[in-house]
Amino acid sequence: MGQEVSSVNNTKNEHHKTNKKSLKGGNERHEMKESSVGISKKIVENSFNNSKLRPGMFIQNSNVVFNEQYKGIKILGKGSFGEVILSRDKHTGHEYAIKVISKKHVKRKTDKESLLREVELLKMLDHINIMKLYEFFEDNNYYYLVSDVYTGGELFDEIISRKRFYEIDAARIIKQILSGITYMHKNNVVHRDLKPENILLETKNKEDMIIKIIDFGLSTHFEYSKKMKDKIGTAYYIAPDVLHGTYDEKCDIWSCGVILYILLSGCPPFNGSNEYDILKKVEAGKYTFDLPQFKKISDKAKDLIKKMLMYTSAVRISARDALEHEWIKMMTSKDNLNIDIPSLELSIANIRQFQSTQKLAQAALLYMGSKLTTIDETKELTKIFKKMDKNGDGQLDRNELIIGYKELLKLKGEDTSDLDNAAIEYEVDQILNSIDLDQNGYIEYSEFLTVSIDRKLLLSTERLEKAFKLFDKDGSGKISANELAQLFGLSDVSSECWKTVLKEVDQNNDGEIDFKEFRDMLVKLCNY
C-alpha cells in the first residue's frame, strides 16, 4: 500500500481507489453480518422447532406462594418429614395433594439430594401407574410437591382389610405395578423401595382398582453395564443381591415377587420377629408354598412368583417378560374397559385433526393436557389408552397404534373392511408424527391426553390464564423472548432471533406475546 501512494501526484487517485476498496469491504462485512444473523435465526428456528417436549419441562422451582395459589382444606397424612395437605387451586378450583416438607428436617446434604432427585425423576416419568407431579416450589421454611389426590388409600391397608386377594384381582394389581416398572427400567430408573405402602389406589372404586407407584426418594438412574452398591430398601421386600452390595434393576422384580406372594396369601414369604431375622431369611432366599392359602392358587401364579424370586439376578425374570407371563395374560384377558362411545368418537376426531408444527402451541397444549386436567376428566381417555396399549408398558408404539386404531374405529361403528392396511398405516404415521411431542418414537400417556381430550374442556378461560402465567414468568402480561428461551433451554439465543421464530403468533409485531395472541394461537390450533 505504501508503494502505491509514494507519489504525491498519485495520492488523490489512490485515495479514491482506497475508499472504493473500503466501501466494498464494508459492504462485504455488512453482507457477512446479515448472513450471520440469518444463519443464527435459522439455527434457533431449527432448535426451537426440534425441541423435545415433555411434561417435566413445566415443573420448575417456581416462585409460587402457597397461600396465594392454594387453599388448604385438610391434612391427609403426616410423616417424619412433614405432612400431606388436601388443597384447592384458587384459580381453577382443582384439588391436589400437596406434600409439605419442613426444611428443618432436610438439613443433611443427603436428605436434600434425595428430595431433589425424587423431583427430577418424577419430572421425567410419564405413566398411568406412576404418581404425577404437577408443581414443585419452596419458601424459607418448606418444600412443596403438588400431585393428584388419590382417595383409595395404600395397597397395604387394602391387604389388611381383605386378608388376601383372588387371583384375578392380584393379577390386575401386579400387572399395573409391572407396567410402571417396565417403563421405569426402559428409562433407566430403578425404584429400590417397592412395597404396598408405596403403592396407592387412585380411587375407592374396588372394580377398577387403578394403582399409583409413589415415593421415589430411594430411586435413582442406573446403567445396564454397572452394578449398584447402596444397601437400601425395606426388610420384607429387599432383594438378597442388595444385601450383598452388588445388584441391578431386577431388585425391583424381587420386590414385585414378594408383593404378589403377599397379595395371594396374606403373609410375607420372608418373615421374622425382628428385622435381623427377616434379613437373614431374605439372605437365605428360601420360602415355601406349603401353606393352606396356596392350596387353591394355580401353578401358573406360583410359577411367576418363582421366576420373580430367583435368587440370582441374572436368571430372574425381567419386568417386560413378567408382563408377558401366561398367568397375567390369562387372568386379565377378559378385562372389559366399558369404553364410552361418545368419548371415543370425540377423542378419535380430536386425534385426527391435530396437526401442528407451532412449537409454542404444542408446549402450551401439553402443559394444559398434562397439568391442568383432573382424574375424572381423563377417566374415559385412560380406558382408551389402556385398550390400545397391548403390551402394557404404558407407551403406544407404531404397531399398537395400527392395531388399536382399527379396533377403536370398529368400536365407533366405522366399516374398516374397505380400508387397506396401507391407508391405515399412512394415517397412523401422520398421527405419530403429529403427536409424538418428545420425538422418542412412542406416544406417551400425557401426549395422548393432550391431543384427544375435549377441546372445549381444555380451553376454558381459567386454564388458558393459568397456562399463560406459566410462560409469563415475571407477570408482566406478556411472554418475552427471554422467558421462552428459558423454558425451551435456548437461553443463549438473541431476542431478534426469537422474534423471527414467533412472527406467526406475534400479531402486533412487538416481539412479545400477550394473552389475546396466546389464546388465538390455541383456538386456531384446536379449531375451536
Curated annotation (Swiss-Prot):
CDD domains referenced in this protein's UniProt entry, alphabetically: EFh, STKc_CAMK
Region named Disordered: 1-36
Any one GO CC term of the record: nucleus
Binding locations of Ca(2+) 3: 472, 474, 476, 478, 483
List of residues binding Ca(2+) 4: 506, 508, 510, 512, 517
Positions of Ca(2+) 1 binding: 389, 391, 393, 395, 400
Keywords: ATP-binding, Calcium, Cell membrane, Cytoplasm, Developmental protein, Differentiation, Kinase, Lipoprotein, Magnesium, Membrane, Metal-binding, Myristate, Nucleotide-binding, Phosphoprotein, Repeat, Serine/threonine-protein kinase, Transferase
Gene disruption phenotype: Replication in host erythrocytes is normal.
Positions of short motif J domain EF-hand interaction motif: 359-368
Pfam families: EF-hand_7, Pkinase
Positions of N-myristoyl glycine lipidation: 2
Function: Calcium-dependent protein kinase which acts as a sensor and effector of intracellular Ca(2+) levels probably in part downstream of cGMP-activated PKG kinase. Plays a central role in the host erythrocytes and hepatocytes infection cycles, sexual reproduction and mosquito transmission of the parasite. During the liver stage, involved in sporozoite motility and thus in sporozoite invasion of host hepatocytes, probably together with CDPK1 and CDPK5. Involved in merosome egress from host hepatocytes, probably together with CDPK5.
Comment field on protein domains: The junction domain (J domain) is composed of 2 motifs that maintain the kinase inactive. The N-terminal autoinhibitory motif acts as a pseudosubstrate inhibiting the catalytic domain while the C-terminal motif binds the EF-hand domains.
Subunit description: May interact with the pre-replication MCM complex prior male gametogenesis activation.
UniProt-recorded name of the protein: Calcium-dependent protein kinase 4
Organism in which the protein naturally occurs: Plasmodium falciparum (isolate 3D7)
